[in-house]
From Swiss-Prot:
The name this protein goes by in its record: Small ribosomal subunit protein uS4c
Organism: Equisetum hyemale (Dutch rush)
Top-level taxon: Eukaryota
Record has Coiled coil as a keyword: no
Listed InterPro entries: Ribosomal_uS4, Ribosomal_uS4_bac-type, Ribosomal_uS4_CS, Ribosomal_uS4_N, S4_RNA-bd, S4_RNA-bd_sf
């Protein structure tokens, strides 16, 4: 399954707010279920809940189905909680790090900057959005002057308290902001409200 490129509002209306996909918000609506539909809903509810959690994770981080499945397989082979390791792998992607630092409004915007070779990690150009960032990595932007002015205005209005503790944003040089990876992210700093165990359960027969 390819990466979704359709209307983002349609997705968040179905899956609720996904900060990585879009900064637009929708109000949650609870559907009323009639008595005749309750028995049917009970049969599909567990699968439906797991599917929705999986879809929220996939669309928030902008992954294809195959990419997410591969991350689940990697997490299963690692020591520790599969769900937490899965979230850690996704959060430490370069495109997500740019988003969490406030360099871009969404993860798709970050992916565009990376693909255009405007992002440096430790002074080396990285053009792979899935690049796995590590502690002590330094991230900088080498973009056209037109974007630099947009970035400066964005960072001026971006609240630093939104940046998770495992990252640091330096504005000592306004025209050359830097992002620092302090350590691997912990569960409390994950930017998406998600029950990762539901995702692991969804893939239990596939991974």
């Amino acid at each position: 399954m390819s990466r979704y490129r359709g209307p983002r509002l349609r997705i968040i209306r179905r899956l609720q707010n996904l900060p990585g996909l879009t900064n637009k918000l929708v109000e949650s609506k609870k559907k009323k279920v009639s008595g005749s539909d309750q028995s049917i809903q009970k049969k599909v509810s567990q699968y439906g809940i797991r599917l929705e959690a999986k879809q929220r994770l996939r669309f928030n981080y902008g992954l294809t189905e195959r990419q997410l499945l591969n991350y689940v397989r990697i997490a299963r082979c690692a020591k520790g909680s599969t769900g937490q390791i899965l979230l850690q792998l996704l959060e430490m992607r370069l495109d997500n790090i740019l988003f969490r630092l406030g360099f871009v409004p969404t993860i798709p915007s970050a992916r565009q900057l990376i693909n255009h070779r405007h992002i440096l990690v430790n002074n080396r150009i990285v053009d792979v959005p899935s690049f796995h960032c590590k502690p002590k990595d330094i991230i900088t932007i080498e973009a056209p002057k037109t974007y630099q002015s947009i970035l400066s205005k964005r960072l001026e209005s971006f609240a630093k308290d939104q940046i998770p503790e495992h990252l640091t944003l330096s504005l000592s040089e306004p025209k050359k902001p830097k992002g620092f990876v302090n350590y691997l992210i912990n569960r409390e700093s994950i930017g998406l409200k998600i029950n990762e165990l539901l995702v692991v359960e969804y893939y239990s027969r596939k991974a």
